[in-house]
Amino acid sequence: GFFAGQIDISGTKYNLVVADKSVGEAVKKWGPQADTTGFTSIIDGPTNSAGISALGSNYEAARFCEDLNTGGFTDWYLPALNELTTIYYYLKPGTTANNTGTGSTANAVSPQPISTNFTSGDPAQTTATSFQTGASSQEFVLPPANYWTSTEFSADRARIRDFNTGDLGAQLKTTVTNYARAVRRVLA
């Protein structure tokens, strides 16, 4: 896996690690549309993901991440909203301007240690060249597309983050497919 940023959760700092793309990324549905799971945390991906996965194989995105065994690790999970936002902040693949919502709008979600809303140029394209759109090898790049989070929004929708403009959304769990990228936490 690869370092993908650091997040502070209740005073404890964690390094986020994204799984290798070849084994740790897939296009999946989130889960059954009319089923409210109750997993709505924006910071606790491990609890969200494990709980969702335990509900059965219909919860494709979380189950894919939870079932991953790579690099000698089995503690992979589908990230919560703030974890995925941190990954976008540090590994944004392209140069497209960000959505610049403010206040309580979509891009006001500011995971720690990030403490400001997005601007059109911040976050900028990652300096990790292997993760940039247009890299000679696309082996590590997070495509500029929508990624599921483990954060449920409603009975029929779950949160997504667009890795092109940073937009935050909520899409239908069972009729829409998006990317799922497995991550893990390591104490910083």
What function would you assign to each model-found segment?
Residues G1-F73, Y90-P93, N164-A188:
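Short, compositionally biased
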